[in-house]
Amino acid sequence: MPVDSKLIRNFSIIAHIDHGKSTLADRILDATGALTAREQKEQFLDKMDIERERGITIKAQTVRLDYTAKDGQTYRLHLIDTPGHVDFNYEVSRSLQACEGALLVVDATQGVEAQTLANVFLALDNNLAILPVLNKIDLPSADIERTTREIEDVIGLDCSGAIPASAKTGIGIAEILEAVVERIPAPKGDPNAAPRALIFDSWYDSYRGAVVMVRVVDGIIRKGQKVRFMATGRDYEVTEMGVFTPHATAITELGPGEVGFLVGNIKSVVDTKIGDTVTDAVHPATTPLPGFKEVKPMVFAGIFPTDSAQYEDLRDALSKLHMNDAAFVFEPDTSEALGFGFRCGFLGLLHMEIIQERLEREYNLDLITTAPSVVYHCYLNDGSMKSIENPAKLPPPNLTDRIEEPIFRMTVHVPSTYVGAVLALCQERRGEQKSIQYASSDRVIITYDMPLSEVLFDFHDKLKSVSRGYASMDYELVGYRADDLIKLDMLVNGDPLDALSVIVHRDKAYARGRDLAVKLKDIVPRQQYEVAIQAAIGSKVIARTTVKAMRKDVTAKCYGGDISRKRKLLEKQKEGKKRMKMVGSVEIPQEAFLAILKID
């Protein structure tokens, strides 16, 4: 029998990076006796090595805990750990939809930061009860009063019931568990209605196929039942069900409010879309759960093997990652400069870095990644629209009416001392100021609309350096906007290098072209003839550098004698060089591309 839903509490933990979310989850597991002493390790829920090293959570993890409260009742707590990074925003919103409450963890030494705010607003959108927890109070620099004031001013939450805690030393953990039971509402749901369950995570298991994490809202899902995924319309038989306690434990049914996993010979996670509704195949629910949307990649880059013999290995590795991560897409791509490879789409820069690192680390591949680009909307003169992911595929200017680029709403939290530097940086990146708000006397929230292409390269690094590491940022897509965008080509000896084509704003094209030309000059090997390196917009060259020719001293054997003799030899050499230049093609080593793409 499913447990009485009055005794269930579903909650997640939301926090900015490094505010102590995973450590708090560890302490909660310890306090409820979920782990034996042998299993207790740092960041138990962060399963991937990369998660542990970077101290971030990428995939949401879920644990069922049984907790006996002070009132003598045993409650079933479901802790749903969410990723905190903005790239995984949609995953966070679905994980939060599976909960009724959230612990808002704020580092008492740092105060409210940008991603805390973004995730809190997601939680408020889903009508969750929010319990503020002030973490790290064991540190001498913790300022509880200032932090509570900031939460009240910036987020507008009542902090009279905020719980001071230290996940490291275990202070306040018992109070947090009691507050979860008392202040987070029990799930509502009709056990007799047609089953509806929300998919909030899925991953691929090489033996069982896709494993789907669900939160049941209405009805009961049983082992052996035929279920339908409403977004794809596909039917599967539930061959296995279970919960994590935190180890996988088999069960036979899930009732309203419960969280668990389903297995049903599902071939790929592409069929298990996050936010989709699972219902009964024979008597399906009439309406799916609200809020589902397809996740679209925002950032594209080419990934090429440095050794072309690794092409098949790269294809296999990408297929395996795609099975586990439906938001990551790829298709074959060829480049004249880099050979065969793949054009890959990611949710954002962090997502791209993680995929690249996993390819190199888990599959031992040696890769070149081209400069990341965003998806541009190119409107042609006939009124049709093309999505351009690869700058080399942009139609010629005489056919295009306008090009639109994605605009992101940036929210930057910064100490007031550095406001000037941050504003200057945002202006320089073609930002449009929306608002400036003082969270407290020394913390400012700046909002800007900015093209994603300007954020991509090194905006985050620059922001950290102008604010001495104190600024934090968050962003969300607000739409597309037309601007004066053009394609910049790099030519070596008159031949375009497709791997270095970029779409830039006209005002920045000259500086960008000059920089690339100067960098290429140091990298292109010297030939027997002069090599021209040019940056061009269409047929107009805007910057040029020249790699000087290597030449033999043809006059070395002339001792004295008439000048015309020497001139004749030099003219003959010049003719030969000219002929070579007409037929010669410059081989550019892959290291050259690596060096340039790294500089970007």
Curated annotation (Swiss-Prot):
Gene Ontology terms: biological process: positive regulation of translation
Compartments reported by the entry: Cell inner membrane
One example GO MF annotation: GTP binding
GO cellular component, as recorded: plasma membrane
Main location: membrane
PROSITE patterns with a match to the protein in the record: G_TR_1, G_TR_2
Residues binding GTP: D18, H19, G20, K21, S22, T23, N135, K136, I137, D138
InterPro entries: EF-4, EFG_II, EFG_III/V, EFG_V-like, EFTu-like_2, G_TR_CS, LepA_C_sf, LepA_CTD
Pfam families: EFG_C, EFG_III, GTP_EFTU, GTP_EFTU_D2, LepA_C
Membrane topology term: Peripheral membrane protein
Enzymatic reactions: GTP + H2O = GDP + phosphate + H(+)
Protein family (similarity comment): Belongs to the TRAFAC class translation factor GTPase superfamily. Classic translation factor GTPase family. LepA subfamily.
Protein name: Elongation factor 4
Record lineage: Bacteria, Pseudomonadati, Myxococcota, Polyangia, Polyangiales
Gene that produces this protein: lepA
